[in-house]
A protein has these predicted regions:
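Coiled-coil dimerization/phosphotransfer module
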Residues: 1-162
Length: 162
């Protein structure tokens, strides 16, 4: 029993460490994306092409947190379901919105099944983006890879730390 409990505790600690958000409050928006990519590459050994063009240096903390979590979950999904094949992230700004695109060349899936059991990551990403007044879409089809696209407004209120 003691060994089983130690093993379970080790497993729970590993999960909890993945839930903790790194300190991104002082990072620029680009550095936040770079941090998400670097963390992913270190954990998986997979490389990600990151293209950052014309984004503001800074953004409200809720936008940085949502961006980080969106990138983290998108890359993790790609790794789990598509072996991290040809992953690419594009970040740009247009009309006061941060546009995030995460693509892979994996096997793809039918987006109509996004809200069924086992697709909680996609639903969680959508909720995070929509809470900030943004939009979220998934483009995919069997055998053709997947693109996750989010538009986040860059003018959201800052959250006071307690």
């Amino acid at each position: 029993i003691h060994t089983a409990l130690q093993s379970a505790l080790k497993y729970l600690r590993a999960i909890a460490s993945g839930l903790r958000l790194p300190e991104i409050g002082t990072l620029t928006l680009a550095e936040t994306a770079e941090r998400a990519v670097r963390d992913y590459e270190r954990k998986t050994g997979k490389m990600v092409a990151l293209a950052i063009g014309g984004i503001p240096v800074d953004a409200p903390l809720p936008v940085k947190i949502t961006s980080y979590r969106l990138l983290q979950e998108s890359l993790a999904n790609s790794y789990r379901h598509a072996s991290g094949v040809d992953q690419r992230i594009d970040l740009k700004e247009s009309d006061g919105q941060l546009i995030i695109e995460v693509t892979d060349a994996g096997q793809g899936f039918d987006p109509k099944i996004m809200n069924v059991d086992g697709r909680l990551g996609l639903a969680g990403m959508r909720e995070r983006v929509e809470i900030l007044g943004g939009t979220f879409e998934v483009q995919s089809e069997a055998g053709a890879g997947t693109t996750i696209r989010a538009h986040l407004p860059l003018a959201v209120p800052e959250v006071e730390s307690e």
